[in-house]
């Protein structure tokens, strides 16, 4: 049986596991059960020498300012140029941002746009992960808004993979769907308010739709409540608990272990995500104390540009988009 020394912050949160006969002056525990000292987390194992093994406690990395940005794009060439500028314009240290880029089974040039962005700006970030492998030939044949259980399962898998990647490195997590456009202050605001473990910036649309449900029905989908419109029109301002946050949100790294997008119910993956959190008594919050961007559904880039120059003209300066976009 091994002897275990439990590291602290000064030792970079590592466990050293020694052979039974090794004499140590430090406090020792005689057990194989590392989870006894740090529950719910996996351990990164490295062999050192002379039978000594090192385990890094990834779960203890709670104090970090590094963030994974999940860019999950399929058939999004119409909005990716504007979206990627919004991501690039975040006023947060890029060396502390890690891009997780996943695209699959496209019928347009989304992959090419993403690769061009990586080629131009990738080295400015802390790291970049890119994967364009196919997940399901069936997905490629489906219409853009053909929502069905198979598609929910694939999208849930994609989202879960990005969560696991952030969890592996102990980073915070931020995702914005590719038709969700966030202003440069967004990630900074999320980090400033990270005491709210799951937090979404309110993103309005031209209609009454937004990236949250104030309450839900028995199946976890939207249900009417007067406070929905009060939040949307900022009659209630600040960070408020809601029953669903979706599309764009921040997750504190110590909450990633509780995230799941698949519960076997074959529902929308965002419904499962929120339902799992509610069952674990983890509150989701919406923050609307500032303008953080907007949400659109355009399938044509020219239509998007027209919409930005017309309906959203008042908001464009907030995004600091380069003049050559139009």
Residue ranges and their predicted role:
Residues 2-30, 34, 236-249, 253-326:
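C-terminal catalytic/acceptor-binding lobe
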Residues 66-68, 98, 272:
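Cell-envelope/extracellular polymer assembly enzymes that use nucleotide-activated donors
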Residues 73-81, 103, 107:
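A structural helix-start
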Residues 85-96:
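Short, acidic, metal-binding catalytic loop of nucleotide-sugar glycosyltransferases
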Residues 102-119, 132-136, 180:
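A conserved acidic beta->alpha catalytic loop
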Residues 117-169:
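Active-site-proximal specificity loops/subdomain of glycosyltransferases
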Residues 163, 183-262:
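Conserved catalytic core of nucleotide-sugar-dependent glycosyltransferases
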Residues 170-181:
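Short beta-strand-to-loop acidic/aromatic patch adjacent to the donor-nucleotide binding site
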